[in-house]
Amino acid sequence: MYYILNPNVGLRSWWLVPYAYYIKGNRNAIGLKKEEFELLSLCDGKHDLEETPLLKRFVTAGMVKALCPCEAQSVSPDPWQKRECDNRYFPAMNWMITGKCNYNCLHCFNAADAAPLMSEFTLEEAEKLLDEAEKCGINAFTITGGEPMLHKHFFEILESIYRRGMFVEELNTNGYYINQEALDRMKAIGCNPLIKISFDGIGHHDWLRNKKGAEEDALRAIRLCVENGFHVKAQTNVHRWNLDSMLPTLKLLDSMGLYETRIIRTTEVPRWNQNAAGATLELQEYFDEMLKIVAEYIKEDHQMIVDIWQLMTILPRQKAYRIRSVECGIGEYRDSIPVCRGNRGMVAIAANGNVFPCLQMSGYYEAKNDILGNVKKDGLQPLLQAGKYLSEVCTTVGTLAEKNETCGKCPYFKHCVGGCRAIALTLTGDKLGVDLSKCLFYKKGYYEKTVSIMGDWVNHSEIQISKN
């Protein structure tokens, strides 16, 4: 009997991950045993295979289907369905296709100073990078800017991603260019990402975005995306001057049918420090104020998920929550865990081609002229084979514990696993420094305070606290 892979199944091999597959539209690859991979590789419509229990299991799972001999003669498998990648495994890319923006936000973490960013990928450069991404086994994209929809070839870039069998998982936008025509074109491409729209509080958005009418445009875009069936996530920066608007903003966004809102402490990146001295919430102040908002939010019936930066994610429909400072639960810690699992799985590329562990760190790296590599000059695959970039993102928490005595000796380290590298770098100037937000969270009892406020809601991040 002849068999062929389901069109949504793509086999992949990388260094250290030689046997895996993607399901089209899902970000991460799934590991296989050698014998499973080899059998699936033969499901190409050209090999007459014995109907083994393993093959029956693949048929039942919908991974392969049987063909009659006449069908097998005309089968031509999609090249997307099998690829060997001569590099380390990275399933995703966070791609700033342009640094240009119709706003000039006061807090932009992409900038090294207060000047607008003007670099971007040409269409030719974008096509070349996508060819390389396909070759390297990249599967999912977060498209960002600047304002990505300002790029004159925005839709051509989307089409090029889908033409190669990859997909856009998230789109970061200020919403200004979202209209019915744009959403219809995205649907025609098959592009249905989580659309993340910036909205920084009722009555405060125009100021932070440095653009009159930005608030009205953001709310219009949010409504239109929801009406068109897109999942929408609001990105909300909180600081001292808009703190009083947070709870009313959450209630408004929930009433509009948003899937999720993320509240982010506006952080001490170079541009924000220049533009808003005194507006940044101190870490303890931030935790205290956020817990007050949480306590009020859960008193009422809400549907919208609220993700509070470095504190917690509230899941109202499940009456559950996850504490963000708990990276590893009881017994989950391993020295081999990357210092940032997000960075290890997602290549971050700025509009000038520079690569970073994450784009939230890009302004700092640019200000220090700390260049880890550049895809326009070096290509993508060499950076995923060896060099400064790969070394940084593959650094493990075991190495962090060895290099950072404070973390290595901390009783909470195996739960926070060193915290966020972007925060540590911003606050200490050390890539392997202490994430002071995690120290504060654990040592000042914020785990216990959070659990107490949430009452009988299900805690998905239970740990045993020991202060000895």
Give the predicted meaning of each segment.
Residues 284-327, 360-408, 458:
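C-terminal accessory region of radical SAM enzymes
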Residues 100-110, 357-360, 405-423:
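Local cysteine-cluster metal-coordination motifs and their immediate loop/turn environment
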Residues 30-48:
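Short amphipathic alpha-helical recognition elements used for nucleic-acid or partner binding
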Residues 86-124, 136:
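Canonical Radical SAM [4Fe-4S] cluster-binding loop centered on the CxxxCxxC motif
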Residues 5-31, 53-94:
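N-terminal [4Fe-4S]-dependent radical SAM core
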Residues 129-145, 434-468:
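Short Fe-S-cluster ligation motifs
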Residues 123-144, 151-282, 286:
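Radical SAM/AdoMet-radical enzyme domain recognition
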Residues 339-344:
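Short, small/polar residue-rich loop motifs at catalytic or cofactor-binding pockets
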